[in-house]
């Protein structure tokens, strides 16, 4: 059952499952998605550790407008919710640009409380020109739907995976121009501020174990970027999967859950 708590004056929707001791898995979606993005992974995660799935403000069952917010508020809301739930240490599992908030959370709390972070398919380079154009497009009230639809098609990459198609068709609605425009602005600001997620990781006051799990883009240069970063930073690792889409947690839930469990095991050593 999805429940809510009032945190920082807004309703934050979540569910809380599993009772295994130790660090809690905390799932965080990308923009304009909610906790259902982790339905496939949930049985594997909660069997290993207590698992709290969090919806960003305005992303729960109540889709009324909530006013402006960004990464600072996303991080503060998540920390406030976990404090209210008496969660001590935890491992964020964040999809796509939810990863910016996960890194902010890790930076604020330190490695003792956040021993690891797993990010699913976030663009690790500086934002490509065509992606920046798409971010600007979804901020234009005259063409935001066209921009949104173009992004979705790029995420799907022609897949026939039914779980991914069902998620996009049935579980990701309810957001209009207000939320999509905000997503474009906040993501654009993150890349302009930090340059890339890897540079954001390097700025952490106390680095924790971080793993990036993804299936695309399927180009050797992207793997080389990850190899170079991992060679310079022993706390970083990555796993390329054989999926087709931007949604590895939906497309390959058992494999992605296994990566989270392995990451946590390594962080405990």
Swiss-Prot record:
Pfam families, A to Z: Abhydrolase_1
Active site residues according to the UniProt entry: 246 (proton donor/acceptor)
Sites marked Increases basicity of active site His: 121
EC code: 1.13.11.-
Residues annotated as binding substrate: 97
Substrates-to-products reaction catalysed: 2-heptyl-3-hydroxy-4(1H)-quinolone + O2 = N-octanoylanthranilate + CO + H(+)
Keywords: Dioxygenase, Oxidoreductase
InterPro entries: AB_hydrolase_1 (IPR000073), AB_hydrolase_fold (IPR029058)
Induction note: Up-regulated by PQS.
One of the record's GO molecular function terms: dioxygenase activity
Effect of residue 246 to A: Loss of catalytic activity
Stated role: Ring-cleaving dioxygenase involved in the degradation pathway of the Pseudomonas aeruginosa quorum sensing signal molecules HHQ (2-heptyl-4-quinolone) and PQS (2-heptyl-3-hydroxy-4(1H)-quinolone) to anthranilate. Catalyzes the cleavage of PQS to form N-octanoylanthranilate and carbon monoxide. Thus, leads to the inactivation of PQS that plays a central role in the regulation of virulence factor production by P.aeruginosa, thereby quenching the production of antimicrobials, which may contribute to the competitiveness of M.abscessus in presence of P.aeruginosa.
Record's subunit section: Monomer.
Similarity remark: Belongs to the AB hydrolase superfamily.
Name of protein: 2-heptyl-3-hydroxy-4(1H)-quinolone dioxygenase
Species: Mycobacteroides abscessus (strain ATCC 19977 / DSM 44196 / CCUG 20993 / CIP 104536 / JCM 13569 / NCTC 13031 / TMC 1543 / L948) (Mycobacterium abscessus)
Organism placement in taxonomy: Bacteria, Bacillati, Actinomycetota, Actinomycetes, Mycobacteriales
Gene expressing this chain: aqdC
